[in-house]
Amino acid sequence: MNKESTDLYEILGLTPSASEEDIKKAYRKLAIKYHPDKNKGNPEAEEMFKKINHANSILSNSEKRRVYDQYGEEAVNNGLNEDSFDPMSMFMRMHQPGNKKLRAQMRHQISLQDYFTKKTVKVTITVDSKCDDCDATGFSDKQKHVCKVCRGKGIVVNEIRNGPFIQQIQQHCHGCQGKKYDTTAKDLHCPSCKGAGINKSEEETEVNVPFDILRNPKVILEGKGPWVDGKNIDLEIVFILAFSDGFELTDNHKLIYTMEINFPETLCGFRRIIDHPSGDSLLIVANPGFVINPHYIYLLERKGLNNDTLYLKFKINYSKLIHIPKKKVFNFENLEIALGTRYVPDVSDDIGTEPENVFNLSTLRQINTDPSDESQDRDSEESYGGHGRPEGVGCAQQ
């Protein structure tokens, strides 16, 4: 889990395609892990517990989740739905220093394969267009029938006096339920747009895939957002990566692959293929006698995101019993017979792999993630965060 994340799905270690059951399971697991009773005196765990509960409160509610997926968290916080959509309330950042334009936001999930192989992807967006039949007023007489209670603001301010103090409380207008128009004039609603003032249609558009998709995942489509004050505002597409089997993301934004091997392969060597999302086949070679340490992470240069490093770690299935052959010569072949079977057979020597896609583990840079090992090289340790464990090697659930 990325503890700095503000995306509600990432906080729960999920993607936007997660089912209701996935959300329930992830919430229960993380709530137990970060519960204050188990993390006394740990302010980071306490803060994470709050984030987990907040994320669950939105994603476990189907209506709130729908609004969040379409418009973002600001829309949920302002209690918006399709009938009371208020872009002004939703995007208050327009009025903050340095923000010149109002923007809507939507999320789009992209696979690792598409990220590595495509420069553009097709995104289906909902486009607002002015209703010409009512001149965008929502009424057949083309007049703006604003709510008489709130004067078209959708909200009212009530004052509560408490002694010498006056408290102001902002609420949805009771006259129009936040819809801003005179609800008593429904008989004048435009039949074409059903009183919305706009017509919605779906449009498929080509969008550039961000190169630095983790730190800068946004692409802005000018004039493709909701209809506000007589024009379409800009639409911000936020790309979210969906990870393939075996691939995850570390806390410091490194792509990591977990290879599963059996005990004999940790000592007797192997030749295995990683199906990289770029379409390349990466040949991983361990020579007989090279010992695979489950605490080590191996670094594959230029095979990660943004041409960065790909991390490779191993999950080792240990044998329950070892059978020592009698009167056998001690060699790797007989050692493997004693230790058990391989996880998968080795690939052949000649499979046509490009030289730059062949990685011998004995020649790769390594990170030792074992905090109890004091023999680590200090320079290597500091390069990856120090303190006996490289910074960010922990993986977010996907």
From Swiss-Prot:
Q: Where are the zinc fingers (CR-type)?
A: 118-202
Q: Please provide the record's keywords in A-Z order.
A: Chaperone, Metal-binding, Repeat, Zinc, Zinc-finger
- Co-factor(s): Zn(2+)
What are this entry's molecular-function GO terms?
Hsp70 protein binding; unfolded protein binding; zinc ion binding
Acidic residues bias: where? 371-382
Where is region (Disordered) located?
A: 364-398
Listed Pfam families: DnaJ (PF00226), DnaJ_C (PF01556), DnaJ_CXXCXGXG (PF00684)
* Origin: domain of life: Viruses
Query: Which InterPro entries does the entry mention?
Result: DnaJ_C, DnaJ_domain, DnaJ_domain_CS, DNJA1/2-like, HSP40/DnaJ_pept-bd, HSP_DnaJ_Cys-rich_dom, HSP_DnaJ_Cys-rich_dom_sf, J_dom_sf
Matches recorded under SMART domains: DnaJ (SM00271)
Record's Gene3D superfamilies?
A: DnaJ domain, Heat shock protein DnaJ, cysteine-rich domain, Urease metallochaperone UreE, N-terminal domain
* Biological processes, Gene Ontology terms: protein folding
State the free-text cofactor note: Binds 2 Zn(2+) ions per monomer.
For the J domain, which residue ranges apply?
A: 7-72
- Sequence ranges of the CXXCXGXG motif repeats: 131-138, 147-154, 173-180, 190-197
Family matches, as PANTHER family: DNAJ-LIKE-2, ISOFORM A-RELATED
What is this protein identified as?
DnaJ-like protein R260
**Organism from which the protein derives:** Acanthamoeba polyphaga mimivirus (APMV)
